[in-house]
Amino acid sequence: MVKFEHHAFPLDLAALNAEVILRCLNNNEKKFKLLNELYVKQKSWAIGSDIIKINELIKKVGFEFNLSDEKMNTCLKDERIQDEILNQRIEAQKKYKIESTPTIIINEKNYAGKVDYKDFKKAIDKKL
């Protein structure tokens, strides 16, 4: 059995807010699609230093997944969600000794930074 988990590791406020928007979505299947879309469009929203503008760009991606402006704004103001994300980041950093992003963990082994697809595939195939 293969289980994929996404653990946020925000390095700045833009990444934190993108993860907050992701957590606004209740449908797990759609969450991975939204996560993928956020990564694909990252260069279009993770630009500049004006967080209000960045949030509007992140929300454009959320709109594609039928998240309302009201729902996303409510989530962005929810400090519990932010605290949960940041606490998970701290725990993961300690547990897995994460020093760079992305870091992929397969059965407790770290693959950090840019991972060659062939090496990554071999590691997964060995576990299947």
Model-derived regions: residue spans:
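C-terminal cap of thioredoxin/glutaredoxin-like
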Residues: K60-L128
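Structural alpha/beta surface segment adjacent to cysteine/selenocysteine redox centers
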Residues: M1-F63
